Amino acid sequence: MEKTYVAIDLKSFYASVECVERQLDPLNTNLVVADESRTEKTICLAVSPSLKSFGISGRARLFEVIQRVEQVNKERLQKAPKRQFAKKSYIYSELSDPACELDYIVATPQMAKYLAVSAKIYGIYLKYVSPEDIFAYSIDEVFIDATGYLGLYNVDGRGFAQMLILDVLKTTGITATAGVGTNMYLCKVAMDIVAKHIPADKNGVRIAELNEQLYKETLWGHTPITDFWRVGAGTASRLEKLGIYTMGDISRWSLDHYLIGKLYKVFGKNTELLIDHAWGIEPTAIPDVKSYRPSNNSISSGQVLQEPCNYERTRLILWEMADMLSLDLVDKGIVTNQIVLTVGYDKESLADGHYTGEVVCDHYGRKIPKHAHGTQNLGRHTSSTRKIIDTTMALFDRIIDKTLLARRLNLTACNVIREEDIPEVESYEQISLFDMAEAANADNNAEEKERALQEAMLLIKHKYGKNAILKGTNYTEGATARVRNRSIGGH
């Protein structure tokens, strides 16, 4: 029996939520979601569809939005009566008047609000399908195995998708794009690529469909290849070096044993995924995704600093991150035996011309010093705040260039396991003839007291909020924990 999968993506979700909250039409309002208090370099979390139509990227920085709007208004001014604007408006339809100046709303991010609306929409989906047949891919995107529901509702895949989307629109005012396919890959590609090139209906809804044959006929020659799910810039660059630019190219290579060997040399096991996707094949189903557990678990804490930070302030912020990471481990009942740290430097580090080390290009093509990266083993699995902070600080001091300005921090606890799964060999401590039993006992007592303190802090934080109990360091000038504790996802 042929399967039917549906992928649904809420259109410019954050921006749509902000428009609906203001009783504005999300498809007819120029709005950007960004935190103006973080300077004009802040990344926009969402841009409304109408504002995107002026050539603004969905992930632009605020200053890029400002510059583009200024440019658009300069062009509009040339066509305005007497070269003067009579009014300005953030309503897209009003811009049909040549005397109207383009305006837009800057909405401060409300992550808690977006999560609540996302949960409400998920509840709408559950009116139609069982939880076992739906997978939440992100806050605004889901996969649904619709196979068993088409007969129940007497619809095809397109009709099923439309039924759900219209209910969401009626209930929340938010519209969506959907893809329908015979597997999870094809429905995702139908949504990401095909739906973008078809006209929207009267509700702004776009629904595209793909099966394996249609995929080959319409998308084997599609460029850029990065439009396809799971093909990033790095993969595309390596493919280009082999002379591969399209999914059709990959499928042709897969028919030649020699060329397959070349692919395996570059991509290893991922070659199988590339070839499957080139042919429109995806054997993974929703139950497989839900039951997957990575073999090597880790837990990370990352932070993009609001401004370039010197050594002292970066060290302070990292201390807070290590402190919070250890509490997170205790809260989850897990332990780690390895810390990995990455420090990304800011482009301003090159301003004085004194840096002589390796230079790389960041995501935006700007030259920056190569990041610092290091690993430090803890000796045994632990969630001790003292141990994790001390190890993190020592690792930081070992890898950092104190003359450079930091902009990104990523701290990872690796080889994470449950406390009850700690190997027996780690539970015993070998004491030599020269060790003092009292010292060993004192260390154990210190860890027991520390654990009691950690659990007490977590109890207070869960009951009264993350900022209900803090350490003196968190009140030091330049610390960020108090602000981050009041935000979700950094906003």
Q: Which role fits each region the language model picked out?
A:
Residues 1-276, 282-286, 433-435, 440-491:
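Gly/Gly-Pro- and Ser/Thr-rich, intrinsically disordered tail segments characteristic of DNA damage-repair
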Residues 7, 227, 237-406, 426:
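DNA-contacting surface of Y-family translesion DNA polymerases
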Residues 11-13, 37-41, 345-350, 416-420:
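Short, charged/polar surface micro-motifs in flexible loops or helix N-caps
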Residues 38, 151, 185, 304, ...:
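Generic "edge-of-domain/loop-turn" microfeature
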Residues 143, 377, 410:
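Short aromatic/hydrophobic contact patches that present stacked aromatics
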Residues 182-185, 276-278, 335-347, 405-418, ...:
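A glycine-rich phosphate-binding loop feature that marks nucleotide/adenosyl-phosphate handling sites
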Residues 394, 398-453, 458-459:
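C-terminal hydrophobic structural anchor segments
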